Curated annotation (Swiss-Prot):
It is an enzyme of class 1 (oxidoreductase). This is 4-hydroxy-3-methylbut-2-en-1-yl diphosphate synthase (flavodoxin). Its cofactor is [4Fe-4S] cluster. Coiled coil: none annotated. It comes from Saccharophagus degradans (strain 2-40 / ATCC 43961 / DSM 17024). GO terms for molecular function: 4 iron, 4 sulfur cluster binding; 4-hydroxy-3-methylbut-2-en-1-yl diphosphate synthase activity (ferredoxin); 4-hydroxy-3-methylbut-2-enyl-diphosphate synthase activity (flavodoxin); iron ion binding. Binds 1 [4Fe-4S] cluster. Pathway: Isoprenoid biosynthesis; isopentenyl diphosphate biosynthesis via DXP pathway; isopentenyl diphosphate from 1-deoxy-D-xylulose 5-phosphate: step 5/6. NCBIfam families: ispG_gcpE, PRK00366.1. Converts 2C-methyl-D-erythritol 2,4-cyclodiphosphate (ME-2,4cPP) into 1-hydroxy-2-methyl-2-(E)-butenyl 4-diphosphate. It comes from the Bacteria.
Length: 370
């Protein structure tokens, strides 16, 4: 029997980033960020489309100059996914992309400048109903906070965030979310936990500059997992020095592992040993690659022998338990058929696609009857 998620999410206000709800009772959204030159419109559009295909809900784009702002306007016209403009130093860039159709403005309290500049951004955002993200980062805290604390700390991150929350409150602007990111897992977790008790706005989670594909995945999974288990977090971004598509995949895997969202196939597979009756690792790699396009939630077990195979296979939609001379396949917990070693992956792929299509059709039929 599969356990239900025990997580009770923190109550937060809901904002809209384009047509995507963030906070409140909305699903936790997944973001990524382009790493192309924004002025290269073709490359940036192509990457955004790949990120969207991978399952992202929102994409952030760095806008470091006015030339990039104009390019952002061209990009905005060519993609359908909500776009966040990442703004540093020059508040005038925020004003320009607001006019060009941005769905959310990320500003950094550590470098956006005086309150007068923030007010200009707030006024523009209010006029056009654009949400703002107050994006605090341990690597770019305000100079006075660096002096006060000596080094980045959870308290410093939270103080920076609250300072700018107070500014937005003063001007009666509530259409915003907040992040307090650090590359240190414990610092980020402590900061988010403290901030979560002091504001009601949505929280954007991330472990900043987490590292490469393997190390960054581990750090992000540990840090974000701790917070999400606490019920903290309304949108997440996994920061990896890797293809942004990988960020989306990891983000989905984190949410799926905590049963906070479902999409595509949840594979359960043994690490393989000398008892395996087929090549588990090769089979898994093939199936993951071939079935990436399936979005219907489905649990699939691939177990190499009869020790744990039947037990795992009974708990999933499609289960494979290795055997000799044939491998036993379960469908919806019931033994269904046996597959030869030859063409094992082809046979499994065909069966999984059939089950996914049937499940999708049933869900559509239920919705149609409601």
């Amino acid at each position: 029997m599969q356990f239900e998620s025990p997580i009770k999410r923190r109550k937060s206000r809901q904002i809209m980033v384009g047509d995507v709800a963030v906070g409140g009772d909305a699903p936790i959204t997944i973001q990524s960020m382009t790493n192309t030159e924004t002025t290269d419109v073709e490359a940036t559009v192509a990457q955004i489309e790949r990120i969207q295909m991978a399952g992202a809900d929102i994409v952030r784009v760095s806008v470091p100059s006015m030339d990039a702002a104009e390019a952002f306007g061209a990009i905005r016209k060519r993609v359908s996914i909500p776009l966040v403009a990442d703004i540093h130093f020059d508040y005038r860039i925020a004003l320009r992309v607001a006019d060009l159709g941005v769905d959310c403005l990320r500003i950094n309290p550590g470098n956006i400048g005086r309150e007068k500049r923030i007010l200009a951004v707030v006024d523009k955002a209010r006029d056009l109903n654009i949400p703002i993200r107050i994006g605090v980062n341990a690597g770019s805290l305000e100079k006075d906070l660096q002096t006060k604390y000596g080094e980045p700390t959870p308290d410093a991150l939270v103080e920076s965030a609250l300072r700018h929350v107070e500014i937005l409150d003063k001007y009666d602007f509530q259409n915003f979310k907040v992040s307090v990111k650090a590359s240190d897992v414990f610092m980020a977790v402590a900061a988010y936990r403290k901030l979560a008790t002091q504001i009601e706005q949505p929280l954007h989670l991330g472990i900043t500059e987490a590292g490469g594909l393997r190390g960054g995945t581990v750090k992000s999974s540990v840090g974000l997992g701790m917070l999400l288990m606490d019920g903290i977090g309304d949108t997440i971004r996994v920061s990896l020095a890797a293809d942004p598509v990988e960020e989306v995949k990891v983000g989905w895997d984190i949410l799926k592992s905590l049963k906070l969202r479902s999409k595509g196939i949840n594979f359960i597979a043994c690490p393989s040993c000398s008892r395996q009756n087929f090549d588990v690792i090769k089979t898994m790699n093939e199936l993951e690659m071939r079935l990436e396009d399936i979005t219907t939630p489905l649990d699939v077990a691939v177990i190499g022998c009869v020790v744990n195979g039947p037990g795992e296979a009974k708990e999933v939609d499609v289960g494979l338990a290795g055997g000799t001379p044939k491998n036993l396949v379960y469908v919806n917990g019931v033994p269904s058929q046996k597959f030869e070693q030859e063409n094992l992956v082809d046979s499994l792929e065909q069966l999984i696609r059939k089950q996914a299509a049937e499940k999708e059709a049933k869900e559509k039929d239920i919705i149609a009857k409601v």
